Amino acid sequence: INLQSLANWREYVTSDQAQLYGDDLSRFADMNLSPDFPTNARLMAALLKQVTGKSVDGVLTINQNALADMVAVTGPIAQNHRILTSENIADYVTKDVYSDFKNPKEKNIAVLSLIQKTFDKLKGGAGGPFGLVRAFAPPMHTGSMMLWASDKSIEKKISSTHVGGSFDNLSNPTSAIVLVNGAGNKLDSYISESVQYSQGICSIDAPYRDAYLRVKLENNAPESGLPNYVTPRNDLPVGANYKAGSTRMLVYVHVPLGSEFESATINEKKVIPIAEGFDTGRQVWRFDIELDPQSDATLFVSFQEVAEGNEPTPSLWTQSMPIDTSAVVEKGQRCVR
């Protein structure tokens, strides 16, 4: 699937999404650029049909944390002379598996085998009569598992729940930070993120208020020792020199519609958005952050957000990452008009 592009990708996204993300959305690896899971799932299902000719009833995604939740119910999984438990399987599939398998195809087969063994245990009754509930409930509520149905009536019900991952409700969340690996490497498991969203004072003569977003990223990747296929810089020209363990993160800042950009800095150096547009009823600005191994960088965005006095309570969405994200919302006083 990775080798093919979806020919008619524009049919599955909005015109705003097409303009913001472009034909990157046609590639499987980039079908998660939007934080709106139904958008991503429609693209994935369409690509699978293009490749195989078969339609699917739905799309289910899990990450390493969901796998750990499941293994907590199934019990340990034996793989490649290792005993993987709920305590170590997340680190294994995001880091250690690359040491066991230098060949990326063999690595992919190993990870798929782990997932298959886990689901086979669940189907076999591991965890007792409520095993599936115990395995699925935690990731469904933490964002580690997402579900989409091709049947519109079923999808309508799913999209109203947390597991649906829909951004149709503009009141929840009001803002979001989306990280995308712009280098095309395997270093996400070494990236930690902390986000602070703060509301400031209300404007006296206009229906706006000050607002700020602070995003700090740390790259904890080692400077040596990782397999070459973990550390490439596919964003750079062929033959370009770069530090092993370095990466580039694309930061998409989603804020309430009508917000006006004021200024931004990366490590206190002024920057402007690389791109801007709209996605699921929110204003979006993109910033690119270069990170050397064992380094950090801070993006600070100042903007004006609409404040007419009837806005929803501010909330912030961040995606599930291998390293837990620290997210803080500082709510300002309600503006009176």
Where are these regions (language model features)?
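Flexible helix-coil linker/hinge segments at domain or subdomain boundaries
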Residues: 328-330
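Non-catalytic, solvent-exposed segments at the cell envelope interface
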Residues: 1-326, 335-337
